[in-house]
Amino acid sequence: MGNKKALKEEAFLGSAEEGADFDQAMFPVMETFEINDPMPKKRNWGSFCTAVMAIHLILLTAGTTLLTLKVLSLQKWILEKYLDNETLAAEDRSFFSLQLASPETHLVPRTPGLQALQVQLTQVRTSQEQLLQQVDNLTRNPELFRIKGERGSPGIPGLQGPPGIKGEAGLQGPMGAPREPGATGAPGPQGEKGSKGDKGLIGPKGEHGTKGDKGDLGLPGSKGDMGMKGVTGVMGPPGAQGNKGDPGKPGLPGLAGSPGVKGDQGQPGLQGVPGTPGAAGPSGAKGEPGHPGPPGPTGPQGISGSPGAAGLKGSKGDTGIQGQKGTKGESGVPGLAGRKGDTGNPGLAGPKGEPGRPGLKGDPGMKGSSGQQGQKGEKGEKGQSFKEVRIVGGTNRGRAEIFYNNAWGTICDDNWDNNDATVFCRMLGYSSGKGFTFGGGSGNIWLDDVNCQGTEDSLWNCRKNNWGSHNCNHNEDAGVECR
């Protein structure tokens, strides 16, 4: 196919070159005709001019016919080469032929052969216009009829011709004879300071530096000074003893005694046998934060032991005798502030006072030293975990029941399928389940219209009606078979 197109293109270019040679041979003959030829002195000049005009018209007609044939052949060749659909209408083809004759042709401008052909067609058209203009000038020349006419107006400037093809590079000239070096010229003036150059490109990213050494551990902070204890006021003198009054109502609880001084820390004793839990004693004062000790080695995790038995409840003590109410003494004169006394012996523990308001959260204490690792306890007995669902009537097959509101109840079989049964069985430790109707239950019917996806961990996460809302009887109780 490509060879056929190449042969057609070469044949067309050959015909175009022959037409161009014919035009070049024809037009120089036409151009040699001079308008201002000297008039012969013969009397038959008019018939000679008529014959010349007839010859020119015949040649012009022949050239136009040849040009039309070339345009038609060019149109046919372009239709065969560049248009796959050959069903163009006649009016489209005539319009296309006019476009080919126009100097503003845009047919495949990127093909070198068509560009050369377009240049040749433009030259032919320009030569034809010049020929028509010369013939028109011959017919309108008054000197042919020995009548001097008026000077004509200047003609319209012609269209600008297409740019010529770039000529080949000329031969390199011979190298000139060497000359003696000229005298050294005077140094030129100092040039102006150049403008600041553009900012350079950002350099490549440097390599990561080595990781620095770990810093030394800081010293522990010093312990702050303890604040001064407030001075207790002087107690007033005791009043005279009054008459014994009637037994009064139980008095308010006494004030809590001051906490005793913290004793020195004893050495850790041997681990004793765990005894029964005693009664809760009063909370001691907050100890001073100890210095942080070195971290001890991490011991293996011991097995959780069984919870100890609950201790027996102690018996209620006897109510003490109500003391006599003394008269209120006069307020003494506040004495001078004395020196800070020595720490007294710890007093007896007073009755438990009412719980005070919760104090502000204290600052976190420093981490204490790690205690010695305790002995490994005995393995406790396995406890029974409470299940929120159960199977009644068999180990893994039976009626499905669920525990809610401190009571067991059944599930209605409306929309009960294998996905719901799988979630139910998963709550009992199985991997899958199968749902069906079992019936025979009693008591509450807790769930109805359960709609699980099969991926939930509990029936509480599934879509369902409200607890206790149903329209079923116990003959519709749901059953499961867990696997």
Curated annotation (Swiss-Prot):
One of its GO terms (biological process) is innate immune response. It is a single-pass type II membrane protein. Glycans are attached at N85, N137. It is found in: Cell membrane. One of its GO terms (cellular component) is plasma membrane. Residues 70-483 are extracellular. InterPro entries: Collagen, Collagen_superfamily, SRCR, SRCR-like_dom_sf. The keyword DNA damage does not apply. Residues 148-383 form the Collagen-like domain. Residues 389-483 form the SRCR domain. N-glycosylated. Residues 153-166, 273-286 have a biased composition (Low complexity). Residues 146-386 are annotated as: Disordered. The chain crosses the membrane at residues 49-69. This is Macrophage receptor MARCO. It comes from Mesocricetus auratus (Golden hamster).
